[in-house]
């Protein structure tokens, strides 16, 4: 069983040309977060983050094909600028009033590498392989936008 869970947990690592404090703050300051969160082609329509252990977050977006999605979760660990952990689940049809789907956990570590930051994200375990791969693509696109945001605001 553990082997299945391991193949359905993403591990992504990227080096960002910014200090751990700047990268961490891009995750926890709402007006910064909305500028890069979600992959290209998705417009954030609503975002609320209450970054503290036990605090909630939710985000609603619209993709190019007109599909609305909504996700939400709870912050579990907030250790600036070292670690961030929160739960994650999608809502059916982009409606917060509808039940949440399969819940996963997002764990992020921020490590100084000179004046840069190595960010490692673990997200999962997912219910199936298509969901795992879809989130891999989503995080990859979001990280590209985060990189551009950090460059633009340096």
Write out the residue ranges for each language-model feature.
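Hydrophobic-ligand binding "helix-grip"
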Residues: 34, 39, 47-53, 58, ...
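Structural signal for well-ordered, non-membrane alpha-helices
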Residues: 24, 34, 83, 140-143, ...
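Short, surface-exposed helix/turn micro-motifs that flank interaction/cofactor sites
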Residues: 24-25, 76, 111, 140
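A conserved amphipathic terminal alpha-helix motif
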Residues: 125-154
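Tryptophan-centric aromatic hotspots in well-structured domains and transmembrane helices
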Residues: 27, 88-90, 139, 143
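Hydrophobic beta-strand positions in extracellular immunoglobulin-like domains
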Residues: 16, 123-125
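Well-ordered alpha/beta subsegment
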Residues: 117-121
């Amino acid at each position: 069983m553990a082997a299945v869970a391991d193949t359905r947990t993403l591990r992504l690592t990227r080096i960002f040309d910014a200090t751990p404090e700047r990268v961490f703050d891009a995750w926890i300051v709402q007006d910064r977060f909305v500028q890069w969160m979600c992959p290209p082609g998705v417009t954030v329509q609503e975002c609320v983050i209450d970054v503290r252990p036990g605090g909630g977050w939710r985000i609603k977006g619209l993709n190019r094909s007109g599909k609305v999605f909504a996700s939400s979760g709870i912050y579990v660990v907030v250790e600036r600028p070292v670690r961030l952990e929160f739960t994650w689940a999608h809502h059916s049809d982009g409606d917060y009033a509808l039940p949440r789907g399969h819940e996963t956990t997002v764990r992020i570590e921020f490590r100084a590498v000179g004046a840069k930051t190595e960010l490692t994200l673990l997200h999962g375990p997912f219910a199936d392989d298509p969901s795992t791969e879809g989130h891999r693509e989503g995080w990859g696109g979001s990280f590209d936008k985060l990189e551009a945001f950090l460059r633009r605001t340096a």
